[in-house]
Amino acid sequence: FKEHDQAEMTKFEETAKRVFGGAKVVGDIATMNQALVSGEIDLHLTGGTYSVSPARADGNPNLRGITPKKGPMAGGKGGISWIEVTSTVNNPELSPLAVEFLEYVQQPETAHTVAFAEGTFNPVAQMGNPACFDLFTKEELDAIQWDSLEEEMARSVEYDIVPDYEKALDLMTAAKRAKG
């Protein structure tokens, strides 16, 4: 989460070319999950709970999102946690429904529904409320890897802004396209 010099960007480009060049499949989460389920591939980068949870919910508990025990991040951590929030913004013309909507999505039943939005299943902050947590079945908790969430988070740093994101994305996109 820092600005990278030319040597670092060159190394990133070379790594992206090597990773995507050696990939059997390059695709979106659904494509990658199908390839995992069918046995076409053994792993996919990058992912996590959100990427394999639908496949786990469909009866594939052998698939798991795994955070490396160590890596190049601060403190030697190997993962990055991505936490999304819903909030109002400092807008002089804030919708009168904004606060009402926030209250709605905080309700235990709604938060449970949000946790299982189509395509990705995720833990939600409202699970700290027993009224919400109690709505989750054993199978749903298993699908979102609740058993290892604390451990995965401990191995991760919080996401931050990547100053040269656009340049890195261009390099990665070019490497993916070269794969074909």
Features from the language model and the residues they span:
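Ligand-binding pocket segment of bilobal, Venus flytrap-like solute-binding proteins
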Residues: 1-67
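Non-transmembrane alpha-helical segments in soluble domains
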Residues: 13, 17, 33, 37, ...
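Soluble non-cytosolic domains of exported or imported proteins
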Residues: 27-30, 92-96, 159-166
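Solvent-exposed loop/turn segments at secondary-structure junctions
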Residues: 49-53, 71-73, 93, 108-109
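Short beta-strand->loop
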Residues: 61-80, 89-90
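Short coil/loop residues immediately preceding or within conserved phosphate-binding loops
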Residues: 83
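Mature extracytoplasmic/periplasmic domains
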Residues: 86-152
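Conserved C-terminal helix/tail region of periplasmic/extracytoplasmic solute-binding proteins
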Residues: 143-180
